[in-house]
């Protein structure tokens, strides 16, 4: 993964106000009425980068405080640190087992990437995702960047930018950012590998699907903002997909949020998306788009999908007809989970982070 802005550098944005607003689609007049928010109850406070979390049927929270490197359990008002590590994300649970991801590295390279699991008795296991990525690199044959620039134009691009904007395949990178634990398999949204992975109970990793890239046409504004020569204007730039979360729908398909690569806020438009992925065949379908930072999603039992828009300051809802509208305005949301008829959302993730529970009506 090589891109102007990457999830690996989100921690550097702590304290920065991100106020770019998305303009969501509205539900068709004759379509089903989307849900609206009811009461809002705070369930965890004073968190440091709660980018991902999970909630159990009894209300216990397992929280990845990414910027602090903490995996925290909150139950009955009491908080307990279960694990420490670098860049903790991809938190999910199944019964008394909790899964999370750890990453060591920066925007340029990754030094370690692990999928971790902790059982009820405190036993922790680790799967080396970086070793698998180095051996397999599922998007190695993809084509990203500018693909049709003349040689004299390429020569004008600053050398330090050329690996990011020149034509290139998927680099060796992995960032276990979202996960979903099921009985015999854990699915991973890998924001570095640009793919959805499956990890079986023996720890074997396989590729479910590589998400499709998105594209934009370079404008004068884009060229100026990134220090690119004017000869790139009017050319198509292919950006890498950035899978951020994965959930199972009631139709048996996986639902996956993705950032667009390149600038991941709305500075070049709200380009985040939700995809449907067939876990048996790897087929990928675009389900909805136009999100300003689609970093987390939840699927209700009736098939309604909720999407956290980190840079849009809202949670959006997608009806079963595929119509998108705003569900609730919340500051800098990241994770979103559904449990027992309520929506749980992590908010203010770049400052004094919180998790709230929102009723529906």
What is each residue range found by the language model?
Residues 27-361:
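Extracellular beta-propeller repeat domains
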């Amino acid at each position: 993964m090589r891109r102007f802005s990457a999830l690996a550098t989100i921690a550097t944005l702590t304290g920065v106000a991100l106020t770019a607003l998305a303009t969501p689609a509205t539900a068709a007049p004759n379509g089903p009425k989307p849900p609206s928010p009811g009461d809002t109850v705070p369930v965890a406070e004073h968190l440091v980068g709660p980018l991902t979390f999970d909630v159990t049927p009894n209300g216990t929270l397992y929280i990845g405080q990414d910027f602090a490197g903490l995996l925290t359990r909150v139950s009955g008002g009491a908080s307990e640190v279960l694990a420490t590590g670098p860049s903790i994300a991809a938190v999910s649970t199944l019964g008394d087992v909790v899964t999370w991801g750890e990453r060591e590295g920066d925007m340029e390279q990754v030094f370690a990437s692990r999928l971790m699991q902790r059982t009820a008795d405190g036993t922790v296991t680790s799967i080396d995702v970086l070793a698998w990525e180095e051996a397999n690199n599922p998007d190695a044959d993809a084509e990203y960047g500018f693909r049709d620039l003349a040689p004299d134009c390429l020569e004008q691009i600053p050398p330090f930018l050329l690996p990011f904007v020149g034509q290139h395949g998927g680099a060796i990178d992995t960032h276990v950012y979202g996960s979903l634990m099921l009985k015999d398999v854990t699915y991973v949204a890998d924001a570095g590998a640009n793919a959805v992975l499956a990890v079986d109970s023996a720890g074997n990793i396989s590729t479910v699907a590589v998400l499709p890239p998105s594209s934009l046409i370079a404008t004068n504004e884009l060229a100026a903002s990134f220090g690119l020569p004017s000869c790139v204007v009017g050319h198509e730039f292919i950006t890498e997909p950035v899978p951020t979360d994965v959930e199972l729908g009631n139709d048996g398909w996986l639902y996956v949020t993705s950032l667009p690569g390149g600038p991941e806020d709305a500075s070049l438009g709200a380009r985040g998306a939700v995809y449907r992925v067939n876990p048996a065949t790897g087929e990928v379908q675009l389900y909805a788009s136009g999100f300003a930072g689609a970093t987390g999603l939840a699927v209700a039992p009736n098939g309604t999908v909720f999407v956290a828009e980190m840079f849009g300051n809202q949670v959006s809802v997608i009806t079963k007809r595929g119509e998108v509208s705003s569900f609730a305005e919340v500051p800098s949301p990241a994770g979103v989970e559904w449990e027992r008829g309520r929506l749980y959302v992590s908010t203010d993730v770049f400052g004094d982070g919180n998790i709230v529970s929102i009723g529906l009506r």
